[in-house]
A protein has these predicted regions:
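Active-site glycine-centered loops adjacent to acidic/histidine catalytic or metal-binding residues
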Residues: 343
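Terminal interaction modules at protein C-ends
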Residues: 1-338, 347-617
Length: 617
C-alpha cells in the first residue's frame, strides 16, 4: 500500500523516464548516441539499448531477447556508454550475451584516488528511416542519475532539437558532444554530425533561457563554484554530498541573514548532514537545513549489486544516497531565477577535480506558465523534505573509519593497477597482467567471465587460464571481486582481447547460442515485418535459451515479405541482411531442431535467388 508520502510525491512531482528521452520519435531511428555516467548496471544498459530501437518500456521492464538482439546488431558502432572504469556492475549469474556490451562500453580510466569520471549526459542523433528529406532530430539530456536501477530524487534538463528547425541556437552542445566523442575515441566518426550540430535549433520552453552548458574534465583550469550573487533573495541548494569548502563558498557573497526564515536552504541526506556537523557546524549554521526520508525502494531486492560505499568525498561518487541523487542550486534575484543543475555534488572534488557536466538556466520572473510550474514544483519538493536540526553527534570509532579508508584505497588502486589483456591460446582464454599485483595483507581477489564462477588471483601471479568455454562466451569485461575482512566490492574490469574478438568468431555464434534457431527465425520475421513484430515466441532478455527442447513451428514469412523488405527502407534492408548472415551460421543442436533448420535453409535459398535477381546490373 502506498504511504501518504508516496501519494504526496506522486501528486506534486510527476516523474519522466530517461528511457523515454532515449526513445526516438515515431518513424525515426537512432543514428548515433553518446551516453555518459559515473556508474552503470548491465541490466539498465540493456534497457537503454532496447529503448533506442523502440523496444523498451519506461520502467525498463519487459525487454525481450529479440529486442536485445536487434539492439545489439543495429546499434553496434553507433552507441557508446562512457562509464568510470571499475564502476560497471554485472550480475553474478548472467547470460554470456552481456559480453556483447563490450562493443558499447567505453571505460574512462580516471584514477579515483584523485578524481572520477562523473558527468551524466546523453546526446542522441535520430534520422527518419523512411524519408531522406526529413531533417534529423537531436535529443539532449543532462542530469544527476547514473545508469542504475536506483529510483531516488533526480533533476534533469531534457531538450529536443531539429536541423534547420525553429528554436534556440545552443553552441555549447557542440562542445559537450565533441569532448564526449574525443573521450570515447570516436571523434572521426562524429565529424559530420558535429558540423550538423551548428544548424540545430533547440526547443526551449517559453520563459527559460539556456545560459551555459559545459562539460568539465580533470585538469581544466577555468572551473570553479560560482557563489550566489549578493542580491539573491532566495536560495535552495540540493546535494546528497557536501563539504565545508563548497558549503562556505556558495554563500560567501551573501550577508548573514538576521531573520532565520531568510537563510539559504540546504537539502541533503541525514547521514551527510550529520557527518558534516561533526567538524563544520559553523558552515552549516548559515543555512536552514532539510533532509529527505529514506527511499521506499530501499527494501526492494536488486538483481545487480550496487557499488559499495567509498567513504567521505570519494563516496560522493560511489555511494550516492538512494533517497537523493538530485544536484542543483535554485537562486531567485529581484528580476530572475537561475537554476544550476547537473552531475556535480557540493564538494571541492566535484567542482575542482572530477569530470562533471553543468547546465545553467535563467528563468524570467514572474514569467509564464512554465516558470511558475517549475517554481511550484521546487516548492513542493522543498515542502516534501523534513527539517533537520543540528544535534550532538558522537564520532564513529576510529578503527571503523580507518578500515573503510584502507579498503577504498585498495580497491581504487586495484582498478588502476590491474592492467591486463586476454588472448586465446589453444582455444583457452588466458588473462595476462602487465606487472604483478601487490595486494594488501589478507586481501582476496577473484576474477572470472560474466556469468562464470570466480577464480582466485594470488598476489605475484601475472597470468591465469580461465575455465574451458566456447570461444564466443568470452568478452573484454571481466568480473572482479575484492574482499578484505568484512568489506567487499564487485565490478567489471576492462581487459581487452589481443587480437580483438571478431564479429564472425564471437558475436555471430554468441547471438545464435543466445537466441536458438527458433529465436533466429523469429528475429528474421520481425525484420521482415514493417511493424517489427512478425510473431513467434519471445522470452525475457535475461532468461536462458534452453537447447534440445521442442522447437515451435514458426512459419517464416513468404516471398512477398522478402520483396517488401527490399523496397521498404535502407535501414530495414541492412538489418535484415545482417540477420540473414546470422541465420547462415545456424546449425541444429538436436534432432528436434532439424525441421527448423530445413525451413531456414529453404528460406535462405529463396532469399539468395531474389537477391541475385534484384541486384543484377
Amino acid at each position: 500500500m502506498a504511504s501518504d508520502e508516496d501519494d504526496k510525491q506522486a501528486k506534486h512531482l510527476p516523474t519522466s523516464s530517461l528511457l523515454d528521452v532515449l526513445t526516438p520519435p515515431t518513424g525515426y531511428i537512432v543514428d548515433r548516441a553518446l551516453c555518459s555516467a559515473y556508474s552503470g548496471q548491465c541490466a539498465v544498459l540493456v534497457a537503454m539499448l532496447a529503448a533506442m530501437v523502440r523496444q523498451g518500456t519506461a520502467e525498463g521492464k519487459g525487454s525481450s531477447d529479440l529486442a536485445l538482439a536487434r539492439a545489439l546488431e543495429r546499434l553496434k558502432d553507433r552507441v557508446h556508454f562512457l562509464v568510470q572504469h571499475g564502476r560497471l556492475i554485472g550480475p553474478r549469474s548472467a547470460s554470456p550475451i552481456l559480453n556483447m556490451l563490450d562493443r558499447f562500453v567505453v571505460p574512462v580510466k580516471y584514477d579515483e584516488r584523485k578524481a572520477s569520471w562523473h558527468p551524466k549526459v546523453c546526446v542522441v542523433r535520430c534520422v527518419n528511416r523512411y524519408s531522406v528529406k526529413a531533417k534529423p532530430i537531436w535529443l539532449l539530456w543532462i542530469g544527476s542519475r547514473n545508469f542504475t536501477k536506483d529510483e531516488s530524487w533526480d533533476m534533469a534538463l531534457s531538450l529536443t532539437g531539429e536541423v534547420d528547425g525553429k528554436g534556440d541556437e545552443l553552441a555549447d552542445v557542440n562542445s559537450i558532444t565533441r569532448r564526449l566523442a574525443q573521450q570515447a575515441g570516436v571523434e572521426a566518426q562524429w565529424l559530420s554530425a558535429l558540423q550538423e550540430l551548428g544548424t540545430v535549433r533547440w526547443q526551449v520552453p517559453a520563459g527559460l533561457r539556456i545560459d551555459k552548458l559545459v562539460l568539465f574534465t580533470h585538469g581544466d583550469l577555468k572551473r570553479d563554484l560560482e557563489p550566489v550573487p549578493a542580491n539573491a533573495r532566495s536560495v535552495l541548494a540540493v546535494s546528497p554530498f557536501l563539504d565545508e569548502w563548497s558549503v562556505s563558498n556558495l554563500v560567501r557573497l551573501l550577508p548573514p541573514a538576521t531573520d532565520p526564515t531568510k537563510k539559504p536552504r540546504l537539502i541533503s541526506t541525514v547521514a551527510c548532514l550529520s557527518e558534516m556537523a561533526k567538524k563544520h557546524r559553523l558552515a552549516l549554521a548559515r543555512y536552514n537545513m532539510r533532509s529527505l526520508p529514506e527511499s521506499s525502494q530501499d527494501d526492494q531486492p536488486e538483481e545487480i549489486d550496487e557499488p559499495a560505499n567509498e567513504g567521505a568525498d570519494a563516496g560522493a561518487d560511489a555511494a550516492e544516497s538512494r533517497g537523493l541523487h538530485a544536484k542543483f542550486v535554485w537562486i531567485e534575484t529581484p528580476k530572475r531565477g537561475e537554476l544550476r543543475l547537473g552531475s556535480t555534488n557540493l564538494t571541492r572534488r566535484g567542482w575542482k577535480e572530477n569530470a562533471e557536466v553543468l547546465a545553467t538556466v535563467s528563468v524570467a520572473l514572474p514569467g509564464g506558465s512554465y516558470s511558475e510550474q517549475m517554481r511550484s514544483g521546487l516548492k513542493a519538493f522543498d515542502d516534501f523534505c523534513s527539517e533537520y536540526e543540528l544535534g550532538e553527534e558522537e564520532a564513529p570509532p576510529d578503527d571503523e573509519l580507518r578500515l573503510q579508508r584502507e579498503f577504498d584505497d585498495a580497491r581504487n588502486a586495484l582498478v588502476v593497477d590491474f592492467v591486463a589483456t586476454q588472448a586465446l591460446q589453444d582455444s583457452v582464454a588466458v588473462v595476462t597482467l602487465r606487472s604483478p599485483l601487490h595486494l594488501p595483507v589478507g586481501a582476496c581477489l577473484r576474477i572470472g567471465r560474466i556469468g562464470d564462477a570466480l577464480m582466485p588471483w594470488d598476489a605475484g601471479v601475472t597470468s591465469l587460464k580461465l575455465p574451458d568455454a566456447p570461444a564466443h562466451d568470452n568478452g573484454d569485461l571481466l568480473r572482479m571481486e575484492l574482499v578484505i575482512g568484512d568489506l567487499s566490492s564487485e565490478w567489471l574490469q576492462h581487459a581487452p582481447f589481443v587480437p580483438s574478438l571478431s564479429r564472425d568468431t564471437r558475436d555471430v555464434p554468441l547471438l545464435h547460442a543466445y537466441l536458438g534457431i527458433d529465436g533466429v527465425i523469429s528475429l528474421l520475421n520481425d525484420s521482415l515485418t514493417a511493424g517489427g513484430n512478425g510473431g513467434g515466441r519471445r522470452r525475457p532478455w535475461n532468461k536462458p535459451h534452453t537447447t534440445g527442447t521442442s522447437v515451435q513451428n514458426i512459419a517464416l514469412l513468404g516471398i512477398e515479405a522478402v520483396l517488401s523488405s527490399w523496397v521498404r527502407d535502407k535501414e530495414s534492408l541492412s538489418e535484415t541482411k545482417r540477420i540473414v548472415e546470422l541465420a547462415r551460421k545456424c546449425e541444429a543442436t538436436s534432432e528436434k531442431e532439424e525441421k527448423a533448420i530445413q525451413q531456414l535453409k529453404a528460406f535462405l535459398t529463396s532469399w539468395d535467388a531474389i537477391e541475385q535477381e534484384l541486384v543484377k546490373p
